[in-house]
UniProtKB/Swiss-Prot annotation:
Membrane topology: Multi-pass membrane protein
InterPro entries: UPF0761_bac, Virul_fac_BrkB
Originating species: Shewanella sediminis (strain HAW-EB3)
Protein name from the UniProt record: UPF0761 membrane protein Ssed_0302
Pfam families from the UniProt entry: Virul_fac_BrkB
Compositionally biased region (Polar residues): 301-310
NCBIfam families in the cross-refs: PRK01637.1, yihY_not_rbn
Biased composition (Basic and acidic residues): 282-298
Major location (coarse): membrane
Residue intervals passing through the bilayer: 45-65, 102-122, 137-157, 179-199, 206-226, 247-267
Gene Ontology CC: plasma membrane
Keyword annotations from UniProtKB, A to Z: Cell inner membrane, Cell membrane, Membrane, Transmembrane, Transmembrane helix
Segments for region (Disordered): 282-318
Assigned protein family: Belongs to the UPF0761 family.
Length: 318
């Protein structure tokens, strides 16, 4: 039997959600994520070609990925650059091809620019978490290098595994044959959740609870998927940029999408960082309310509760 929804619990949930939204709104106003997103969008466009060049270089170093480079490129451009993906892919591949012909000094410069992007992301997210302790140069460089090297490899490995599973004969003609296309269709969503979850768990120089990071990752992934579809519809139905800029329309379109993407990433980070703050604030309010009720009945009990709460806060700080 389906249990009836308790009106008190529903009221408490709605009220808590509303209070959390108020807290989140205050946080967004303080952090000015629109300005930070603009900065990250600028750095991303500056680092886009170096990042793609480094990614493709890493994939070419592993023979197992040689046959799926086109798949990986198509997956990235189709799922992360709506509507203008084909045009952007042509230009970026041409730029990457030119960059790969450069000298060792030029390639090293590309690596530095790519690391600049990761460093900017690191600083932006740690500012959201209000972290004051900075990582050492060795730890930071190791983390950035791991992202540059392992990121493309993990992406390629996931696509290889997916292609292998789909091609298995056990799925052909079985009851699961209809499930596989659905799973493949949902792959971008799963990939988005996993990517955001990894960012929110690893990048902040502070311990982040898995549930909080998962909540922020799911919200960000949903907004990202809806944003892709909405942005593609807007470009198709209202081709304003193409009418104004003509052949150069790809540039403002790409910048707008990158900016919107960073807004979504930072919003998910704000949700993740705001969760423990709100829960601590609510718990503190409950403790104060309990103390006031106890004081009304017995001052001695009030003193005991106050002492216990203060000791608990000191232990948490330590």
């Amino acid at each position: 039997m389906i249990k009836k929804i308790d009106g008190t619990q529903l009221h408490t949930f709605v009220l808590s959600t509303w209070h959390f939204m108020i807290h989140l709104k205050q946080r967004l106003a303080e952090d000015q994520i629109n300005i930070r997103a603009g900065h990250l969008a600028y750095v991303t466009l500056l680092s886009l070609v170096p990042m793609v060049a480094v990614t493709m270089s890493m994939l070419s170093a592993f023979p197992v990925f040689s046959g799926i480079r086109g798949q990986i490129e198509g997956f990235i451009y189709n799922n992360f650059l709506p509507a203008a993906g084909d045009t952007v892919q042509v230009y970026i591949n041409e730029f990457v091809s030119n960059a790969s012909k450069g000298t060792a000094v030029g390639i090293a410069a590309l690596m530095v620019v790519a690391i600049m992007l990761i460093s900017a992301i690191d600083k932006a997210l740690n500012n959201i978490w209000r972290t004051t302790e900075k990582r050492s140069m060795v730890v930071s460089f190791s983390m950035y290098w791991m992202v540059l090297t392992l990121g493309p490899v993990l992406m390629g490995a996931s696509l290889v595994a997916t292609s292998y599973v789909v091609s298995l004969k056990v799925f052909n003609g079985s009851d699961l044959s209809g499930v596989v296309p659905v799973l493949v269709e949902r792959l971008p969503m799963f990939f988005s959740v996993a990517t955001f979850l990894l960012i929110y768990m690893v990048v902040p120089n502070i311990k982040v609870k898995f549930f909080h990071a998962l909540l922020g990752a799911i919200v960000a992934a949903l907004l990202f998927e809806f944003g892709k579809k909405g942005f593609a519809i807007y470009l198709t139905k209202f081709p304003t940029y193409e009418a104004i800029y003509g052949a150069l329309a790809t540039i403002p379109i790409l910048f707008m999408w990158v900016y919107l993407s960073w807004i979504i990433v930072l919003l998910g980070a704000e949700i993740t960082a705001a969760m423990p703050e709100y829960l601590d604030k609510r718990q503190s309010g409950k403790d104060e309310e309990s103390e006031k009720k106890a004081e009304a009945h017995d001052p001695q009990i009030s003193f005991s509760i106050s002492t216990a709460v203060n000791e608990s806060k000191k232990e948490n700080r330590q």
